[in-house]
Amino acid sequence: MVRPPSARSAVPGVGRLGLLDPTAAASLRELGWDNVESIPVLWALSRAPDADLALNTLMRLREALGSDWQRLDSAIRTDTSLRGRLFALLGSSTALGDHLVAEPAAWEVLRRGDLPDRDELLADLLAAVQATPEAGPHAGPMLFRAGIAGPEAVALLRCRYRDQLMLLAALDLAATVENEPVLPYRVVGRHLTDLADAALTAALAVAVARVCKDQPCPVRLAVIAMGKCGARELNYVSDVDVVFVAEPADATATRLAAEMMSVGSQAFFEVDAALRPEGKQGALVRTLDSHLTYYKRWARTWEFQALLKNRPMTGDLELGREYRDAVMPMVWTASERPDFVPEVQGMRRRVEDLVPAELRERELKLGRGSLRDVEFAVQLLQLVHGRVDENLHVASTVDALSALAAGGYVGRDDAANLTASYEFLRLLEHRLQLQRLKRTHTLPADDDEEGMRWLARAAHIRPDGRQDAMGVLRSEIRRNAVRVRRLHAKLFYRPLLEAVVRMDPDALRLSPDAAVRQLAALGYAAPENAFGHLKALTGGVSRKGRIQALLLPTLLEWLGETPNPDAGLLAYRRVSEALDEQTWFLRELRDEGAVAQRLMIVLGSSEFLPDLLINAPETIRMFADGPHGPLLLGPQPEEVARGILTAAARYDDPNRAVAAARSLRRHELARVASADLLGMLEVPQVCRALSSVWVAVLDAALAAVIRAGEAESGEPAPAAFAVIGMGRLGGMELGYGSDADVLFVCEPRPGVDETKAVKWANTVAERVQRLLGAPSTDPPLHVDAGLRPEGRSGALVRTLSAYQAYYGQWAQSWEVQALLRAHQVAGDQELGVRFLHAVDKVRYPAGGVSEDAVREIRRIKARVDSERLPRGADPATHTKLGRGGLADIEWTVQLLQLRHAHEVESLHNTATLETLAAIEKAELLAAEDVALLRDSWLLATKARNALVLVRGKPSDQLPGPGRLLSAVATVAGWPNNDGGSEFLDHYLRITRRARAVVERVFGS
């Protein structure tokens, strides 16, 4: 038989309550809480951050209260809110628990369910020493004289201060025990500041009574709060930094200041005046003029950073306001000082270095991802931008973050995340300090599970279903530290800052004279035109305009270092206007320094890329760095090719299929060209990527046309169709300005008439050429079949057998040579490979080509050298047909292939560089000669690609020294400060040596 639970068994035992102290059960009996009526009290006690500590302190409080315990016990049982405040307080703070035991009647303070306002705090602290308003010539609203000024004054003030601190802590902690409102961090910080102001006003009242005796106060003394107190974001336990201003700054003023500090430090907290001019070596009290003289002549940068948070606190508030009004203009111009940013950043690093390595991960204030990271970053941004934006003239860190976000200086999400992390870390700091009312910022050690568990409960951290409260706390600490460090790096060290502070103050406002002057200094040839672009970019009062105004000083300087800043700024305006609706664009430029700088390099160097980027804007986001390096290097050509084929295959309409393929080609072209221009890719990588995307688009177009034809006729294609790449396409060595040289080959399906098959294939080839060559927003794709048998007079498409017959009977030497580059690139793979096998007999003949063929090739080469060079071209600097240019190297390689491929199988290769490697391995040329040919081919290809990137259109001729050559040299990766002359000398030297090798091969 199951017995019903008894009344006694319904009462939770100490184990269920989480009480570990061996005396806990006896203590509960002694309190009279081991019964059914006390169950709500017991469960509330169990929720205290440290239930054992709370119970032990309650036992001491019961003893201290004596017969008055019954009143408190009754209140605990009936007033849920009071119970929550009391248990949370006693389970969180041994120091405030000790205070309550020492002053047991003070529990009545906890009956109050709201915070006293600033005036109530002031009245309460002043009443403790019976202070009254000071009379006399220097009377003011914050100057009082204590009626109690003897040694007992300190004890009275300490007790009253602790009462108020206890009430705040109880209200702050109550939500951990009962369902009470959570006090926002900013409310706690402001209340602690109001309490500190009231406390030091009372301390000053005692000082006036002690120093001035029966005489009216003979001086004006202003107490200026600095640091966290000045910013109204004080901790529970914190030094209060002050500066004193007096008129006159005589012995009486000094004694008043010293006495106030002494009383305050004994009764409340450490009062520190070390931020005064000259620090602890300087005079404790100065006149306003003395302060200003020091700040104008001697102050260091960090002192202006400290002044950012100054606030008249007590004493002569009018004098305090005069001080603030006089020093703040100097604060907002501090960023104009030489080396301002490096000095501030260096100071932050030095502070970080002071933290012992073993404590850096536990240090909330000074370690990595700590409170100081946030504060330094925010203060630096305020000082840099506050000189032209009064909205940033705020003192508290959280308010400053809000203002920075509202002004567009930081991202709204970044500001929100940083604020959340900052408030979380400050919450932990508050809880740690409350424990013993000690100034600490260090988290418990990892192996201190008891300490971490207490902190989790005190911070109101709850289990999340996967981890207990302690595990959640550890995860949150790590997550917030990483987030702070990441955002700190974006804000504090981002390269925008140093550039912005080097600009004239007017330049940030972009006033006409300042902007034109600055633009000319930065290398703009037409600064007035450039200024017009700036006005267009920053016009209006929109958030985008403000962000542009923030970015432009840095962007202009980066553009000024490019070959053509004027064109770059125009391009930037075009890109900005085209992406006006893309909210990510300006955010990326502002928050990712690499994106902004790389974009400026690209726009100021290339006429090829701006249109591509406007039509493929997502490429700009790839200018950022990822975890494994630049995002531009992420996609692989094979992946891009598969994506193009997949995208095109989704459409039945060839026009839409080709449009999809060309769109992806546009993105890939923008990516490759950007990475190339930024020096991230080597020449072979560029050529392979460009060739791969060309092949994919060609293959996609061919498949779409065939698919549409089959759908239209309702029958399978009457022939297999293959595209053979020739020239640079066959060698997978395309440049930006290269056409695609191809041959079209078909083979009728079984039972299909050849005439019908060829006619169909011609229709397919013509449509592919037409689709790919149609005008579009990306560079056109010219498919050139001019290398086919009989040239442009011959049939556009032939069957495989027709090709075999022609090459077997009629092939001329130049056609044989052209076949050395033949490679299957699109269409029917099996047919393409059969074509290659068929022409192998022609291009790699047994015994090599005849001497007559060699002589014919030499004759044609000589004619090309003399006749094909365009009129007016310089044979020394024409990258394709000039001396030591691409044609020279490729003809040399091909001649060696024709003569030796029958015996050296590795020469059966369509790629120039790979064939050169085979030539070297077979010792057909000396390694030194091969190196010269390779270097010349790479340099000529690089220069030819650079010409297209710079000019925006195909070109083979290097210009003479000047701005254009300088741009080509820069894009080609050549250090350049001489109009490109050094690059040109290098080009001539390399190609001249290669030409000597070419002449030896063709002369042998």
UniProtKB/Swiss-Prot annotation:
Cite a single Pfam family from the UniProt record: GlnE
What the entry lists under InterPro entries is as follows: GlnE (IPR023057), GlnE_rpt_dom (IPR005190), NT_sf (IPR043519), PII_UdlTrfase/GS_AdlTrfase (IPR013546)
Q: Which UniProt keywords are given for this protein, alphabetically ordered?
A: ATP-binding, Magnesium, Multifunctional enzyme, Nucleotide-binding, Nucleotidyltransferase, Transferase
Write out the ranges of the annotated region (Adenylyl transferase): 502-1004
| One example of a Gene Ontology biological process annotation | regulation of glutamine family amino acid metabolic process
Cofactors, names only:
Mg(2+)
Q: Which CDD domains match?
A: NT_GlnE_GlnD_like
Q: Which family does it belong to?
A: Belongs to the GlnE family.
What role does this protein play? Involved in the regulation of glutamine synthetase GlnA, a key enzyme in the process to assimilate ammonia. When cellular nitrogen levels are high, the C-terminal adenylyl transferase (AT) inactivates GlnA by covalent transfer of an adenylyl group from ATP to specific tyrosine residue of GlnA, thus reducing its activity. Conversely, when nitrogen levels are low, the N-terminal adenylyl removase (AR) activates GlnA by removing the adenylyl group by phosphorolysis, increasing its activity.
Put simply, this protein is called: Bifunctional glutamine synthetase adenylyltransferase/adenylyl-removing enzyme
The species this protein was found in: Nocardia farcinica (strain IFM 10152)
